[in-house]
Amino acid sequence: MTMPLMKPRRKNPVLRTRQMNLPPFARGRTALGMTAAAAEGRFELQVCQRCRAVQYPPRDACHRCLSAKLKWTPQGGAGELLSETVLHHSNDPFYRERLPWRLGLVRMDAGPTVIVHLHGDVPSPLPFAERGHLRNAVDGSRTGPAAAVRVHVGARLDRAGAAVLIGFPPEESEHMADDKMLREMTSDPKFRKVLVTDGKTEVGQALVKALVKAGADIVWVGHAEPWKKLPGLDDITALPQVTLVPLDLTNGRSVTELAGEIGGKVDIVVNNAEVHRGFGIGSRRGTDAARAEMDINYFGLLRLAQEFGPALKGRSADGATHAAAWVNLLSVYALSNYPPHGTFSASKAAAYSLAQCLRAEMRPSGIRVINVFPGPIDDEWNQNLPPPKVTPAALASAIVKALKEGIEDVYPGDVAQEWVARWRDNPKVLERELAAGG
């Protein structure tokens, strides 16, 4: 069984900080289909549309009938562990620094045999000579059939952002998330120090509570106007892990000063600050509202990334609680403009594009950039929209889950799930539907 992770001791500041070495990440275009699914928390393999054979590894033609009609399809993941090996030596710097490392062969119920990283709670299979029989503990005689070692195969993104397969035990254990190998594939908040950029909103306060519940060591909570007493702030500041800090994303000096104070300690940045005004182009004269949205939603992210990004990248291999992730609260409106909230949609589309740049720049350091695309949030700016809407607590829960499972793109809520499905099916049709009112 996995032993619970103990809180690491404070690092000696005199010691050199390790630099990040990524695992091998070269993948062909076809194999990136598995990465695309894993980025959203799904395990998919190619299935031949002619003979229904499941393919592994990814390929351009079916291994059975040579058909090129292969479709990425979700898999259940059940299988039997055939063999395992423990890596005690590697010439690859990433694995060399993390030995020993378990690997295994799993014969999936769907057909193919796959190579997986093995979770520590998966028991070792019997030797081939012993397969199919149990032995008497006294004299070693065969007493009956031995149970196969069952595993559940799931897809995760490794530190380089490439999809890998992991063999999990069929049932979750108490400290399963503390497995050394699994923590290298995820951004679990446990014992990490987190910055939440805006604590005055219901979403921000729900995030703080969810992160504390997930085991965060310290949660710094940004407040642009610390002299104001806003509802809910007293509740979160009463938590021993929480510290309120001055942070105004419209003010470059404010961001720089806070980065100088805590930037070298932050392990996870959660940028939830946003301005949302329900206007289109013609519903309000002037550019003041649109400028305010862009100043926070786009330029705020830019200021934050320029100041906190370098330190985050520099600590991405700094022990068991290394810097791990950057979370951007975007909107499903970023995918296709929603005219009643047109300027807000435009600001989030700009932020989405910038977040893709941030992800590309963070990837060489192994920092995961998580983009969250919720549907309408149940707050004052969506008051007149009918349900379903995403509650702040549900949104916070989805973000913490993404951190724990190493997911890159999250679409919380029924509306977001529906919109992204329609967008993938035909972006132009969705544009026309939204222009016509939905």
Model-derived features with residue positions:
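Rossmann-fold cofactor-recognition segment
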Residues: I236-G252
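Conserved glycine-rich cofactor-binding loop
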Residues: K200-T201
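Conserved mid-core segment of classical short-chain dehydrogenase/reductases
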Residues: T256, E274-R291, G314-T321, P340
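Catalytic loop of short-chain dehydrogenase/reductase
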Residues: D318-A350, A355-Q356, A360-R363
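C-terminal helical subdomain
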Residues: N371, D379, Q383-R424
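A short, exposed helix-loop element centered on a Lys and neighboring polar residues
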Residues: A305-Q306, Q356
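Conserved glycine-rich Rossmann-like NAD(P)H-binding loop of the short-chain dehydrogenase/reductase
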Residues: G215-G232
